[in-house]
UniProtKB/Swiss-Prot annotation:
GO cellular component, one term: mitochondrial inner membrane
Annotated compartments: Mitochondrion inner membrane
Gene3D superfamilies per UniProt: Aldolase class I (3.20.20.70)
EC code(s) of this entry: 1.3.5.2
Protein's UniProt keywords contain Mitochondrion: yes
Annotated protein name in UniProt: Dihydroorotate dehydrogenase (quinone), mitochondrial
Organism of derivation: Eremothecium gossypii (strain ATCC 10895 / CBS 109.51 / FGSC 9923 / NRRL Y-1056)
InterPro entries per the UniProt record, alphabetical: Aldolase_TIM, DHO_dehydrogenase, Dihydroorotate_DH_2, Dihydroorotate_DH_cat, Dihydroorotate_DH_CS
Family assignment from sequence similarity: Belongs to the dihydroorotate dehydrogenase family. Type 2 subfamily.
Domain of life assignment: Eukaryota
Function per UniProt: Catalyzes the conversion of dihydroorotate to orotate with quinone as electron acceptor.
Amino acid sequence: MSYKMFGRCRTACFRSPNLFAANKGMPLQASVAGGASRYIIGTASVLVGAMAGFYIMNSRSAIHEYVSCPLVRLVTPDAEDGHKLGIWFLKYGLAPKLMFDKDDPVLKVEVFGKTMSNPIGCAAGLDKDGEAIDGIAQSGFGYVEIGTVTPLAQPGNPKPRFFRLPMDEAVINRYGFNSSGHKKVYDNVLSRVRQFLGAYFRDDTVNSLALYKDKLLGINLGKNKNGDEVEDYLRGVEKFQSLADVLVINVSSPNTPGLRDLQQEGRLTELLSMIVAKRNSLINEGNVLGASTHKPPVLVKIAPDLTEPELQSIAEAAKKSSIDGIIVSNTTIQRPDSLYTVDEELKNQAGGLSGKPVKPFALKALRTIHQYTKDTNLVLVGCGGISSGQDAIEFAKAGAHFVQLYTAYAYRGPGLIARIKDEVTEELRNEGKTWMEIIGQDAK
C-alpha cells in the first residue's frame, strides 16, 4: 500500500462518525466516559457474580439450612424423591462444599492404624450405590460409608417407603436394602479410583481408598431378601476387599425379614468368624491403589433395640470372632412418646426411625457395649440422632472412637458438618483436651 493511499485510509477512519461515538456528533470525551462506565459495571457484575457463586457453593452459608433444604422438601413431597435429588447434586458436583477445609489438630483420630482428620462420619444409607462419594467427602466428613450393597440388584420394598417427620427432625424408612448390586457399585467405586490414578496432578500422599488425605471409605454389606445369610456377606467381602478402608456387616436393618435374628450370639459369632477368615484369606491380594497387602477392618452394625443381655452377647461374639469394631447403632423400631409428630398414621409407619429421637436409644446401647468391650481393642462407632457438636462429644465420652450421622445432614444441609466440627473444637479447647483423650471418659 502506498503512503498516499494509507494517508487517505487514515483520514477516512478518523472522520468516521461512529468510530469513537455511539451517536453522531457525540464528543470523544463522552464516548470514553461511557466506555469506562460500561467497563466498571461489567467488572462489578463479574465480581458480584463470583461472590454470589462462592456464597452459594460454600457449605457454611446459612442459605442452605434456611432456604435450600426447606425448598427441596417443599418441591419433593415424597421424601424418596428428595433423597434422589440430593444424591444428584452431590454426584455432579453441584452441592455446596466446605471451602478451605482444614481440620483443627485436636479433632484428629487414630484408628485402625490410620489417621482421620476429624471424627465426623457419614452413615450408610445416604449414598447406597457409591455414586456421590466425592460430593459427600467435600462436605467435610472424615469418614464416608456407602451402601448397604447386596450381591444382586434388588428394588427393595414397595413405595412409598420413606417418610419425613420434620417436627422431630426424623425420618422413617422401610427401603428394604434397595441396591444396584455388587457389580454396579464396584464399577462406580473403581471408576473414581481409575480417574484418580490417571490424573496428572494428584496428591501422592493419599494412601486411603477414600482418595482424600486422612479420610476413610467404608463399604456397608448386606444380604439379598432371599439370599443366603452367610454366603451373601462372604461374596461382599470378596468383591469389595480391595476397594474399602473399612468393611461393615449390616445385620440390623429392620426392613429385611429375619435379618436382625443374625444378632443372636451363636449365629453372629459363626457369621463374623467366617467373614474374618475370608478377609484374612485375601490380605495378600492387596488393594486397587497398588498396596501389596490390604487388611480392611471388619465392623458389625447393630440395632439400638436390644436388651443388656443381648448387647453383652454381641460383645462376646465380636471378641470371639476377632472383628475390629462395632457400629452402635442402626435405626429403631420404637416410637418414643417424646415424638412431636401428632399424625398417628405418619409416625406409626412401618420401618426404622432415624434422626434426633434415636439418640437416647443409641447412646444407651453404646454405653452398654462399651462396658463389655472396654478392655479390648474393639473400635466403637457412635451413630444415631447426632446433630450437634455436643451430641458428638457425648458419644465420644460414652466410648465412641468416631461418630456417624445422616438424617441431620439431610435436614440441616451440608453446612452442618463444619458447624459440628467447630463446636467440638471449641469444647475440646475449653477442656484442654483432644478428641482421642475424651474417648470413654465418662465410663472410666
